[in-house]
């Protein structure tokens, strides 16, 4: 009877798909002329940085700019057709008196996150750092007169947290920026567009960011999709990517273009979806062989929105992190800081609670790759050397079949308690028997192969 049960379970498990490791290393579809063409050759340092990035597994995204003052999200300028000259006046009142880079980085580090990605300049066009190439920045245009990016970069380096810079290819406030499908109601004159001027401006700012702020682990681009209505538009990415890799060869480049990676990119990102899913309609691209990252918000918006108190539970956030790791991806979880410079109280509490969980189970996340067993409805697996970590997130039974083929299980224990777990060899895998139906946020079984 047990053999029949195991055989049935093996068939069901195999029908669910291939392993997460194989899925993460596969490609599908026909490459376009802009897809990876093997022209870019990363340095050894860059390859090492990619591996370190994959080991990190968990980062925090911070969307902060003038839009926080209006408390209606980071797209409020275009969503409400705010005139670019009137919007710019917000800078004169931006004074985040409670901002403390030390408190931010400390709270984020306590969560178990290994890196921070900060919006140096979002679509609104306001630079959160002191730039020579525009007066529209935190030091020259606001009474605050402090370089937010500098303080944050210094604190990240001090506390050993990785530093990633978000940089938008869009600017709803610059007259020379190309008009795309967003920001059309901000009043910018069409005749003022000057792509060469705007492109040079962006490269000049990127040079500042990669020269004046110490080691930068990644540049996170956004906005390519603003010109998807104009297929002939050339963002001149190869030249821009080459500049970045020249200034800091180990700096990783990712682009939120919702397509397969382009030549010169070092990791692939997915927005509001896990790799292989497309519930939000933004992540239909095939999974590449590059390191993977999925970004999601802790509540509903990226930037601060006063009415958005729909924060995900700690359990949901942990499950998102675990599901990402089981699909060979990092999780970049977003928080929108308040206009006074504080991280929202609920967000800080979530960070603390995630950190408590990571203190116990971090070993099953950090440094792992997608496991031997593909993701299932019950959960996922992660793997490190000969150790397979079975993350049981949703199981209404005391038994679980793992399709690991002919691999021999040398030992199986409850990761947290180190108590032995019963296993039975079956056709095509092994059957795990638990003492009771798991009710933990994440029941982790460690299997030594």
Located regions from the model:
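Positively charged n-region of N-terminal signal peptides that target proteins for export
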Residues: 1-4, 108
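General helical structural elements
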Residues: 6-7, 276
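Bacterial N-terminal signal peptides
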Residues: 7-16
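Mature catalytic domains of secreted/periplasmic carbohydrate-active enzymes
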Residues: 21-449
């Amino acid at each position: 009877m047990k053999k029949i049960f195991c055989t049935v379970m093996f068939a069901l498990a195999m029908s669910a798909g291939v392993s997460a490791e194989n899925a993460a290393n596969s490609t599908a579809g026909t490459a376009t002329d802009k897809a990876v063409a093997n022209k870019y050759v990363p340095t050894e340092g860059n390859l090492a940085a990619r591996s370190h990035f994959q080991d990190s597994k968990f980062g925090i995204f911070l969307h902060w700019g003038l839009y926080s003052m209006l408390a209606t999200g980071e797209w409020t300028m275009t969503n409400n057709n705010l005139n670019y000259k009137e919007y710019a006046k917000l800078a004169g009142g931006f004074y985040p008196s409670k901002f403390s880079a030390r408190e931010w980085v400390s709270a984020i580090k306590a969560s178990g996150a290994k890196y921070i990605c900060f919006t140096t300049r979002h679509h609104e066009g306001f630079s959160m750092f002191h730039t020579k190439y525009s007066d529209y920045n935190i030091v020259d245009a606001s009474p605050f007169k402090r370089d937010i990016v500098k303080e944050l970069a210094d604190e990240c380096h001090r506390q050993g947290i990785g530093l990633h810079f978000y940089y938008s290819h869009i600017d709803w406030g610059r007259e020379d920026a190309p008009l795309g499908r967003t920001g059309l109601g901000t009043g910018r004159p069409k005749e003022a567009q000057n792509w060469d001027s705007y492109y040079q401006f962006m490269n000049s700012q990127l040079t500042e960011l990669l020269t004046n702020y110490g080691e930068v682990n990644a540049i996170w681009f956004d906005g390519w999709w603003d010109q998807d209505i104009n297929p002939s538009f050339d963002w001149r990415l190869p030249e821009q990517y080459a500049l970045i890799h020249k200034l800091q060869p180990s700096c990783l480049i990712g682009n939120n273009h919702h397509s397969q990676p382009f030549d010169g990119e070092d990791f692939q990102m997915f927005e509001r979806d896990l790799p292989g899913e497309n519930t939000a309609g933004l992540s239909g691209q095939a999974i590449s062989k590059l390191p993977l990252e999925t970004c999601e918000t802790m509540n509903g918006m990226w930037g601060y929105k006063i009415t958005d108190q729909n924060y995900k539970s700690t359990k949901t956030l942990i499950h998102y992190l675990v599901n990402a790791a089981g699909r060979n991806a990092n999780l970049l979880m977003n928080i929108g800081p308040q206009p006074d410079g504080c991280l929202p109280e609920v967000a800080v509490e979530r960070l603390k609670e995630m950190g408590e969980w990571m203190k116990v189970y971090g070993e099953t996340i950090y440094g792992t790759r997608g496991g031997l067993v593909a993701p299932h409805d019950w959960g996922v697996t992660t793997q490190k050397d000969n150790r397979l970590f079975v993350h049981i997130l949703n199981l209404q039974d005391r038994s679980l079949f793992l399709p690991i083929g002919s691999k021999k299980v040398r030992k199986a224990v409850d990761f947290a308690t180190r108590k032995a777990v019963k296993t039975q060899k079956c056709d095509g895998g092994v059957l795990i028997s638990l003492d009771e139906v798991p009710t933990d946020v994440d029941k982790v079984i460690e299997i030594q192969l």
